[in-house]
Amino acid sequence: MSLSPKLICKNVWKLYGDNPKEFLKSHNNNPDKEIIKKSGYIQAIRNASLEVYENEILVIMGLSGSGKSTLVRCMSRLVDPTIGEIFFENIDMGKLSKNELIEIRRHKMGMVFQHFALFPHRTVIENIAFPLEVQGIKRKEREKSALEIIDLVGLQGRENYFPKELSGGQQQRVGIGRSLAVKPELWFLDEPFSALDPLIRKEMQNEFLKIQNSLKKTIIFITHDFDEAIKLADRIIIMNEGRIVQIGSPEDLIMKPADDYVKEFTEDLPRERLLSVKSIMDDKKETNSSATVYEDEKIFSILEKVLSKGSVSVIDRSNNIVGSLSKETVSKFINN
């Protein structure tokens, strides 16, 4: 993940109702939610500011109606924000014409939704190649690109199947492949696996990480499943009533929840299986033991060693000592 922003949102609001821009202006662009409600408006997004870094997987979470999908649609300008600025690759999206926005979405953005709407009368290869057909690319060239994507998403040998001949997981692979056909710089996925059976869902999550490891895309991924978010995310956004409550790494949200709303998402999770040694280690580097553990190991995997040795040194993958971990710290973590 690079710290160079791929997409920036600044003070984005989305209200539904009569002349919402004037309403916001009359309240200094910061009305409280009670005034919004009493005035007959629906608050979809409230003053959202964030940066999406190049090559990161940014997961957006929240309950139904929290504004997740609306925020993503504002980011891609499928929905116009009421006020606020959105920059993609330093381009002010609010200043682009309708045709310029269409061109950016055709060539720079990929989108996958829960209901992926494959063309039933087109084969796998034809579905995946469709965005290239829209771009006017010749058939031979677009089919060559589509075959490469078919290999990438694990559908080798099924290129001439129709959607009705595929399982749900295979159909979703086609949807993912179609969204990758234009080689997008920014990839939006809105609950792409939520309709799948648990085993297929896990398989698709693993496949998704494999694809990301190969392509290094900038990804904005919506889910309501915290286990899925932790597995996939570099950072997570938690939303509530259109407002961004917290942005941070999975470990930040588990160890330092911003409020009770965030805490509710994380309190029943098996923390020892999700958190790394780094999240609970001590900064001091001196120990009475020669035993070591890696900072990125999950806590459950080193419990026996720490509890038997009393204390261990924590090292990075270059074998540099970066901290220590004591039996007392581990015991306190387990019992909290």
Predicted regions and their residues:
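ABC ATPase "signature
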Residues: 247-248, 256, 324
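A short, proline-enriched helix->beta-strand linker immediately N-terminal to the Walker B motif
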Residues: 181-185
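Conserved ABC ATPase "signature" region
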Residues: 26-34, 89-92, 133, 140-157
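The conserved cystathionine-beta-synthase
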Residues: 288-320, 325-336
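Conserved ABC ATPase signature
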Residues: 162-166, 170
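Helix-to-loop junction immediately C-terminal to a conserved catalytic motif
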Residues: 76
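Short coil-to-helix segment of the ABC ATPase nucleotide-binding domain corresponding to the Q-loop/switch region
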Residues: 122-129
